[in-house]
Curated annotation (Swiss-Prot):
Segments for region (Disordered): 23-50, 184-217, 309-379
Family named by the database record: Belongs to the SLU7 family.
UniProtKB keywords: Metal-binding, mRNA processing, mRNA splicing, Nucleus, Spliceosome, Zinc, Zinc-finger
Organism superkingdom: Eukaryota
Compositional bias of kind Polar residues: 195-217
InterPro entries named among the record's database cross-references: Slu7_dom (IPR021715), Splicing_factor_SLU7 (IPR039974)
Official protein name in the record: Pre-mRNA-splicing factor slu7
Assembly: Belongs to the 40S cdc5-associated complex (or cwf complex), a spliceosome sub-complex reminiscent of a late-stage spliceosome composed of the U2, U5 and U6 snRNAs and at least brr2, cdc5, cwf2/prp3, cwf3/syf1, cwf4/syf3, cwf5/ecm2, spp42/cwf6, cwf7/spf27, cwf8, cwf9, cwf10, cwf11, cwf12, prp45/cwf13, cwf14, cwf15, cwf16, cwf17, cwf18, cwf19, cwf20, cwf21, cwf22, cwf23, cwf24, cwf25, cwf26, cyp7/cwf27, cwf28, cwf29/ist3, lea1, msl1, prp5/cwf1, prp10, prp12/sap130, prp17, prp22, sap61, sap62, sap114, sap145, slu7, smb1, smd1, smd3, smf1, smg1 and syf2.
Gene (name only): slu7
Organism of derivation: Schizosaccharomyces pombe (strain 972 / ATCC 24843)
Phylogenetic lineage: Eukaryota, Fungi, Dikarya, Ascomycota, Taphrinomycotina
Length: 379
């Protein structure tokens, strides 16, 4: 053969010689296996293919539609007859809620619910209001039995959270929101109409020269002749405090009475606010000195410490004042001594007063006698 004579051959020559050999010898092993597979009849043509994934072999229950064209029918597993119509879903059937089985019984039956008297459930599953004395003992107001359905569904349908949901119920929610939107739009239209009417009325009033009380508004711009409070010539001693946005005098503590619309207004201080500020200052000073006092974390302890400190300061101040008074006096004794001396100088003795009065009386009698003598001599 040619391939044996030539040691080095091209790929084309080698493949041609190989095909020649195969035609001479017969069909290859692969072709023989394929012919045998074709000639053997399939035992079960509807057998499940284990290599097809489940999400392809079984369509979900919510995606099934009788009218739609099945595009993956060649990969679906054969439908099995199930009580729910050969589907894994419960389409068209679900638990009936609140349906009763005919009229209620007239007397209590053995094995029924002790609370309401129905045979469809026990006491622990009863949804009726708990009675003081149940139907078992009273035999009154026995409820009818509920309809209990046994629906066989697949594993996925049992665990599907949307199973049994009716999408038509959401239409009620949409209708409710649409009504709210309509009412809101109507309110906005009415408000716009009222605003337009008010604007027109104000324009008409300004044109005609008559001003209505409703159309009078405060001017948003300052008048040209208006002067700011801190630029006035008569307020030389006033100072503007930007923190409180007010005008203050030189002391800075008293507010200035301003008649120009409350330029010197400030929030009222004192009362509990002042007490809290004192307590906060005490806490800060105590923390600096090493005492741990926290007003926010423990306000009761802080208040007690503040009161103790206040009482101790008052007692120490009293001791200091008393020691100063004992050493130097309060000055009232000297004033009393001066007043007493002045009174002694001003008020004379009673004996001196008697002597002076007697001497005055004697002098008066002597003068009268002299006058009488002179008169008699003249006569």
């Amino acid at each position: 053969m040619s391939y044996m004579n030539n040691t080095f051959q091209s790929n084309y020559d080698y493949s041609k010689d190989k095909n020649f050999m195969s035609t001479d010898i017969g069909p290859s092993m692969r072709e023989m296996k394929a012919q045998k597979r074709r000639s053997r009849p399939m035992d079960n043509p509807d057998a499940d293919n284990p290599y097809i994934p489940k999400f392809i072999s079984t369509a979900p229950w919510y995606a099934q539609d009788d009218d739609a064209v099945e595009r993956l029918a060649h990969q679906r597993i054969g439908k099995k007859e199930t009580p729910s119509g050969g589907r894994s879903s419960i389409e068209g059937s679900w638990y009936v809620r609140g349906k009763k089985l005919g009229p209620a019984a007239t007397k209590y039956r053995k094995g029924a619910c002790e609370n309401c008297g129905a045979m469809s459930h026990k006491v622990k599953d009863c949804m009726e209001r708990p009675r003081k004395r149940g139907a078992r003992w009273t035999g009154e107001d026995i409820q009818a039995d509920e309809v209990i359905q046994d629906i066989n569904v697949s594993w996925d349908a049992k665990r599907d959270r949307w199973n049994g949901y009716d999408a038509t119920d959401y239409k009620k929610v949409i209708e409710r929101y649409e009504k709210l939107d309509e009412l809101q739009n109507k309110g906005e239209e009415n408000r716009d109409a009222s605003e337009n009417s008010a604007v027109k009325a104000s324009r008409n009033s300004t044109v005609s020269g008559s001003e209505d009380s409703a159309s009078i508004t405060t001017p948003s711009l300052r008048m040209r002749e208006d002067v700011v409070a801190y630029l006035r010539a008569d307020n030389k001693n006033l100072q503007y405090e930007p923190k409180s946005r007010s005008m203050r005098d030189e002391t800075g503590y008293h507010m200035v009475d301003d008649s120009s619309g409350g330029a010197g207004f400030v929030k009222a201080s004192g009362g509990e606010k002042e007490d809290f500020e004192k307590l906060q200052m005490f806490a800060w000073e105590a923390e600096r000195s090493g005492t741990r006092v926290h007003v926010v974390a423990n306000p009761t302890a802080g208040e007690l410490e503040f009161r103790k400190n206040k009482a101790s300061r008052m007692t120490t101040q009293k001791h200091i004042d008393q020691s100063i008074l004992d050493r130097y006096g309060d000055g009232t004794s000297k004033v009393k001594d001066k007043k007493a001396k002045n009174n002694e100088k001003e008020v004379p003795d009673l004996a001196i007063l008697d002597k002076s009065e007697k001497s005055k009386g004697e002098s008066n009698t002597d003068e009268e006698s002299e006058n009488l003598v002179i008169v008699e001599g003249d006569l």
